């Protein structure tokens, strides 16, 4: 007796195979909208203590989830050690390769620090482009570089995290930090007379 396959059974098998293929081809996103592939604190240059690394990873995680905006910090020894010549290119490639970002627009920001080259670069994607203007990035760099120059990378990264929170909040309120809307300098009570 010859066995025949019904068209309905063939259609169901084809659809099941298609669903499986799409599920395997799509990046693995967690329920919260982030790709769940890499740590947000990537200290390849090993400039942080284990405690600092853990503290910063927790801060990046908390901020990213609360703001629905991926915030990443990466250190490298040098561009040469990575076989690259451009901070911008390396930062953008790292962001893409690791599938960082929140949601379909991959909203986020990545700070890359090359220790040996004494350079830093901020890469933005999705809503990060709105929140981090060129003037805002320059201002943020001015806030971080004194600590980096002193070799206190943990302090510089804490500054980056705090300002990133402020930048995203200001942008969501319709006032991203830019040339005509820069953060106000803190009021000093040291000299009042």
Q: Over which residues does each language-model region extend?
A:
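Folded, non-transmembrane soluble domains that reside on the lumenal/extracytoplasmic side of membranes
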Residues: 29-191
């Amino acid at each position: 007796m010859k066995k025949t396959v019904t068209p309905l059974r063939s259609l169901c098998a084809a659809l099941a195979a298609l669903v499986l293929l799409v599920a395997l081809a799509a990046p693995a996103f967690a329920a919260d909208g982030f790709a769940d592939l890499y740590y947000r604190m990537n200290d390849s240059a090993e400039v942080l203590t284990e405690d600092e690394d853990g503290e910063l990873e927790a801060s990046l995680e908390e901020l990213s989830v609360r703001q629905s905006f991926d915030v990443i910090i990466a250190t490298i020894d040098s561009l040469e050690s990575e076989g690259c010549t451009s901070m911008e290119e390396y930062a953008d490639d790292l962001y893409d390769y690791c599938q960082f970002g929140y949601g379909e627009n991959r909203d986020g920001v990545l700070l890359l620090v090359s220790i040996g080259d004494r350079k830093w670069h901020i890469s933005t994607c999705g809503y990060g482009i709105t929140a981090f203007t060129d003037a805002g990035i320059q201002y943020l760099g001015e806030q971080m570089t004194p600590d980096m120059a002193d070799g206190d990378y943990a302090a510089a990264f804490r500054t980056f995290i705090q300002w990133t929170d402020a930048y995203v909040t200001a942008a969501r309120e319709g006032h991203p930090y830019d040339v005509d809307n820069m953060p106000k300098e803190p009021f000093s009570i040291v000299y009042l007379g």
